[in-house]
Amino acid sequence: MIVIGEKFPEVEVKTTHGVIKLPDHFTKQGKWFMLFSHPADFTPVCTTEFYGLQIRLEKFRELGVEPIGLSVDQVFSHLKWMEWIKEKLGVEIEFPVIADDRGDLAEKLGMIPSGSTITARAVFIVDDKGIIRAIVYYPAEVGRDWDEILRLVKALKISTEKGVALPHKWPNNELIGDKVIVPPASSVEQIKEREEAKAKGEIECYDWWFCYKKLE
C-alpha cells in the first residue's frame, strides 16, 4: 500500500493531453502535482468537481501545483465529457485526465474501494521531488471541497519552506489566528532556546511544547 512519505511510482499513462510519464512530467519542471481520481465520467457529483476545480485552476498554479485527474473510463469518454462540460457549462477543462481503463494505476495507489470496480474520490499531493506529501479520500457520494485542498497545498508548501507546522483551520485558527506553530522542542537545549526566543518576543508560547509565531 502506498503511504505518505513514499516516492510516487514511476508510470507511463495515457491522458487527454497524450502520453505522460509520472512523476517526471511535473518534477522535471520543478512542479508539484495533484493526482485526483473520480468515480466516473458523465456523473453529477464528478461534473460539479471538475467545474469547481477548473475555475480554481489558476489558484493551484500560483502555488506551483498542477492537477491531473484519473478514472477507469477510456480516453474518448473523458474527451466527450469535457466537450459536454464546455458546451453546457461554459468551462473548458484545461488539466489532463488519465484514462486508467484497466485500473492498473488506481489499484497500485489504493484508489479502488473494497468490493468496487470504480475509483473513490482520492487526492494525492506529490512534491517536486516526487514524494507523496498528502493523501485524502472522499466517498463516491460526497464531492470534494477544492478550497480545503488548496489550503492543504498552501500549508504543505509553507511547512516545507519554513520548517513550521500549521494549526487547525489555518489561517483562521481559533487559538492563534494566522500564526504558525514552531516544532516542539525535542531536547533540553531546545527548550532553553524556546525560552530565549520567547523572552526576545520572537515567539509566543502556551507552554514549552506549544509555541507559535508570525509567518515570516
From Swiss-Prot:
Any single Gene Ontology cellular-component annotation: cytosol
One Gene Ontology term of the molecular function aspect: thioredoxin peroxidase activity
Pfam family, one: AhpC-TSA
Active site per database record: C46 (cysteine sulfenic acid (-soh) intermediate)
First-tier enzyme category under EC: oxidoreductase
Major localization class: cytoplasm
Top-rank lineage group of the source organism: Archaea
EC number: 1.11.1.24
Subcellular location: Cytoplasm
Xref: SUPFAM superfamilies: Thioredoxin-like (SSF52833)
Record: residues binding substrate: R121
Disulfide cross-links: C205-C211
Chain ranges of the Thioredoxin domain: 2-158
Family, similarity comment: Belongs to the peroxiredoxin family. Prx6 subfamily.
Quaternary assembly: Homodecamer. Pentamer of dimers that assemble into a ring structure.
Name of this protein: Peroxiredoxin
